[in-house]
Amino acid sequence: ARAWAVNAHGPARLARIAAENNLTLVHLSTDYVFDGDTDRPYTEDDPVAPLNVYGASKAAGEVAAQTAPRHYVVRTSWVVGEGRNFVDTMRGLAERDIRPQVVHDQKGRPTFASELAKGIRHLLTTQPEYGIYHLTGAGDEVGFDELAMAVYTGLHRDPDMVQPVTSERYFDGKAHARRPSISTLSTAKIEATGFVPQNWRVGLA
């Protein structure tokens, strides 16, 4: 219920306020609106097919946000910023020389919060066509294990300390929400407006 209140009902209220006051609504969404059953990066035109409650509530929020005449729905993935996140967790483990088990069969691209902010500012200042835009870090698609290895390498630790495992093995016996196996989002649409995201490996360095 909380997920729907925050991710669906909240955007609906904001969309009404934006419409009534002729404001531009920026709504952040997620790769979790997709099911991961793809062999290429997702485009903005691909149909949504969420696997869990969070993804379903975010998909509903997208629909609600688009009722505002002036809107930018920004889908992103694997966000890295202040506070707790995957990269920060891996850095902590690397600094303690811990050998973590990390899933290798969930793939995507990290997005640094600073780059996300730059992309949103670009949309608001250049005002391209309203709609949905994908905004993630540029660069190669990686599994969480490969991202962890990049973190270990950056801290001068042996990347082989990271132990790749399947999601099935990692979550064996643990309660967890289903996640898309492929989370890679195509950024061609926002790039066509003049914003080219930074390679995530540059941001990680």
Regions found by a protein language model. Give the residues of each.
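NAD(P)-cofactor binding segment of oxidoreductase domains
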Residues: 1-26
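SDR active-site strand-loop-helix element
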Residues: 25-30, 35, 74-76
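Active-site "gating" loop of Rossmann-like NAD(P)-dependent oxidoreductase/epimerase domains
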Residues: 31-51
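Active-site Tyr-X1-5-Lys
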Residues: 48-72
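NAD(P)-dependent short-chain dehydrogenase/reductase
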Residues: 63-108, 113-117, 121
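Glycine-rich Rossmann NAD(P)(H)-binding loop
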Residues: 102-107, 133-141, 192
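Mid/C-terminal beta-alpha module of Rossmann-like enzyme folds, strongest
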Residues: 119, 126-174
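C-terminal amphipathic/interface module of NAD(P)-dependent oxidoreductases
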Residues: 178-205
